[in-house]
Each structure stands twice: as structure tokens, then as C-alpha cells.
């Protein structure tokens, strides 16, 4: 099922010289976001910078949010991940989508104009209210945390 997403193009190169965000394959969960830079940016080891995507989005549906995730190849091969590890865009946000890129690697890395820098996944959201209780119903796991279910 495809649903329309309101996108405002802020950089006129987007959709022309720089492709619009797109799914790489029919089975892709994430849209590839691209760097809308005036010129390439070199990230030194340990450095973080905000990279513009050239677009603003407005999800408008409180039952949706957008998550920004790193591209696995950039992280594994070059140490380029998101500075905030995961980005979360609320349904009522209408500003430019920026990607915080962090070079956690040992070598400088240059981000080229139009390079795919992150993935955006649209996810359902359920807003909850709290109900105060004295106890929970029993479960097989109980209060077991960190490693309590074993390694096998």
C-alpha cells in the first residue's frame, strides 16, 4: 500500500540533478536520502556535521512518524553513521529534513553532492496514556532484563 507524503522541495536541484528520495528496490523499507550540498564535505574522524536533504516533509497524520536510519554500507565500510544514531520526525514537523552525519571511523570521508547518506522509514505510531497499577499480570519473563533470556 502506498500513501502520499507531502514534500516541499527546498533545493531546486532535487528531482533534477539530484534524484528525489526513492526506494532502491520493490522490497526496500527505507527511502534513500541524498546530500544536497553546494560542494563535497569532508568529515574528519570524530567529526559530526548536519547535511541538508533539500526537502521538507509534513506527515500530517498523527498515526505516522518518519525514522532516519544510517545506510549499512556507509557505516560498515566507512564508519559514517548518524550523529543522533536514529532520527525521529514527528507528524507535525514541517521543516527541512537534515541528516546528522558522524564519522566514527579512523579516516577522513568525503560526502559527495547527491550521495545517498541515510534512509527514511515511515512507521506507524500509537500514542498511549498511562494507567497506574499496583502489580502486573504474571508473564514467563517477569522482570528479567539484560541477558535474562540467555544466548541460545
From Swiss-Prot:
Cofactor: Mg(2+)
Assigned keywords, A-Z: Hydrolase, Magnesium, Metal-binding, Nucleotide metabolism
GO BP: any one term: dUMP biosynthetic process
Claim: Repressor is one of the keywords in the record: no
Domain of life: Bacteria
Organism: Hahella chejuensis (strain KCTC 2396)
Name of the protein in its database record: Deoxyuridine 5'-triphosphate nucleotidohydrolase
UniProt xrefs under Pfam families: dUTPase (PF00692)
Gene3D superfamilies in UniProt: 2.70.40.10
UniProt similarity note: Belongs to the dUTPase family.
Amino acid at each position: 500500500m502506498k500513501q502520499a507524503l507531502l514534500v516541499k522541495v527546498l533545493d531546486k536541484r532535487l528531482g533534477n540533478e539530484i534524484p528525489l528520495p526513492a526506494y532502491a528496490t520493490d522490497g526496500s523499507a527505507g527511502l534513500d536520502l541524498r546530500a544536497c550540498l553546494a560542494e563535497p564535505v569532508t568529515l574528519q574522524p570524530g567529526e559530526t556535521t548536519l547535511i541538508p536533504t533539500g526537502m521538507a516533509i509534513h506527515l500530517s497524520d498523527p498515526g505516522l512518524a518518519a525514522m532516519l536510519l544510517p545506510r549499512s554500507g556507509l557505516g560498515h565500510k566507512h564508519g559514517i553513521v548518524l550523529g543522533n544514531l536514529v532520527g525521529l520526525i514527528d507528524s507535525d514537523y514541517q521543516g527541512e529534513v537534515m541528516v546528522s552525519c558522524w564519522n566514527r571511523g579512523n579516516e577522513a570521508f568525503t560526502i559527495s553532492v547527491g550521495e545517498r547518506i541515510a534512509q527514511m522509514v515511515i512507521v506507524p505510531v500509537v500514542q498511549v496514556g498511562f494507567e497506574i497499577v499496583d502489580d502486573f499480570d504474571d508473564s514467563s519473563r517477569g522482570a528479567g532484563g539484560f541477558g535474562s533470556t540467555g544466548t541460545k
